[in-house]
A protein has these predicted regions:
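Sec-dependent signal peptide recognition
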Residues: 2-7
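C-terminal motif of bacterial Sec signal peptides marking the signal peptidase cleavage site
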Residues: 14-16
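Bacterial signal peptide processing site
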Residues: 18-20
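A compositional/structural signature for long, glycine/proline-rich flexible linkers
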Residues: 22-364
Length: 364
């Protein structure tokens, strides 16, 4: 009888173990096909190491929900302040996004544009590694070192009119030999948010430690080109949280400031870096979102001083040169300077603009 009881107990234990294993396996392979199903209570715990891929999965699913695979999302208007899906977007360029299955080969074709105008194509891989930009018109092959899909960001400079942008966008095309949907393992939303907030909170410390020149080095790189020499795991994680979809330094150099109080007035006076494309300065709130339609000035829009330098003012009133309003509910603001196709002075000599920021007065 004892042997029978023991045998039954062992059988029950084995069945229970197998059941638990099946439940664990089910949890492990929960797959999301939409952004809505990406977050799950039983999803995988997000860590700083996994965050770049996890945030990229979320972005891919979001675009797939909107247009499916091998399709464009065009905006022939500059980014509206009431619709900013990604932190630190800007109004210096018009955006098109494409979500493409490249598993069996794919290419993208861009139409002719007038000489001197800016149009760039930037592929982002599933693990948030950033390929170097391609410029101008032509047909460009698309490949990836990992996964099966690419997120492609296309930028047209703000000197185009909305009508001109629409005509250009209508002539863009995708040629792909496969159209399989993208899927991702589900993740736990609480851990995702905790990690994201912790990464964003590290930036002031990194700015203090590395300085304005080196703070963003290593955030946006490709394992298959020379940018890999700049890669660090820490900066890779920070880049995904602070500026998902950012560009390689050869294409765009970013300068990020700390937070400034909105109680004061500030000015930046600097020499023109003479970038191959243009520079821009954009104002954000504490969380990294624009809060006014007039959120930026660029070398295409700012009025230069008589000596060829530029002054951009922040919260100094309408009579101040190139003034940007800084009032917003967060009580602080920060800026990002972007160098599009940066000059040798910016790349090789580390010329930066943010260090010239000075408090002028307490009056707005």
């Amino acid at each position: 009888m004892k042997h029978l009881i023991l045998a039954v107990s062992i059988a029950i234990l084995l069945v229970s173990c197998q059941s638990n294993k099946k439940e664990e396996a089910t949890k492990a392979v929960q797959v999301a096909t939409t952004e809505k199903t990406f977050f799950s209570k039983d999803g995988r715990t997000v860590t700083p190491e996994t965050y770049p891929r996890d945030e990229t999965s979320r972005q891919l699913l979001k675009k797939q929900d909107l247009v499916g695979v091998n399709a464009f999302i065009h905006s022939n208007k500059l980014t509206p302040t009431d619709d900013q899906p990604i932190v630190r977007m800007n109004r210096d360029t018009y955006y098109s996004m494409a979500f493409i299955d490249v598993s069996k080969g794919a290419s993208i074709t861009m139409p002719e544009i007038p000489e001197g105008k800016y149009m760039s194509i930037q592929p982002v891989t599933e693990d948030h590694r950033i390929q170097a930009m391609k410029y101008g018109s032509g047909t460009f092959d698309l490949t990836t070192h990992t996964g099966t899909h690419l997120y492609v960001i296309i930028r047209l400079d703000a000197t185009f009119t909305e009508a001109e942008v629409k005509k250009i966008q209508d002539k863009m095309s995708i040629n792909a030999n496969s159209s399989n949907p993208f899927t991702a393992n589900t993740v736990n939303e609480e851990s995702f948010t905790t990690v994201e907030n912790a990464l964003k909170a590290k930036m002031p410390e990194v700015l203090k430690r590395d300085g304005f020149v080196n703070a963003t080095k290593g955030m946006f790189t490709d394992p298959n080109d020379s940018s890999i020499e700049l890669f660090t795991q820490e900066k890779y994680e920070l880049g995904a949280a602070l500026g998902w979809g950012g560009a390689q330094m050869i294409d765009n150099i970013y300068e990020t400031s700390g937070n400034y109080s909105t109680d004061n007035c500030y000015e930046l006076t600097f020499e023109d870096p003479k970038n191959l494309a243009f520079w821009s300065i954009t104002v954000y709130d504490k969380k990294g979102f624009m809060f006014n339609d007039l959120a930026n000035y660029s070398s295409n829009t700012a009025q230069a001083n008589e000596d060829g330098t530029y002054t951009v003012s922040f919260g100094c009133g309408a009579d101040s040169p190139n003034n940007l309003d800084i009032n917003n509910p967060s009580g602080v603001f920060n800026i990002v300077v972007r160098h599009y196709q940066p000059s040798k002075r910016v790349i090789n000599d580390d010329y930066r603009i943010v260090p010239f920021m000075k408090e002028v007065s307490n009056e707005q």
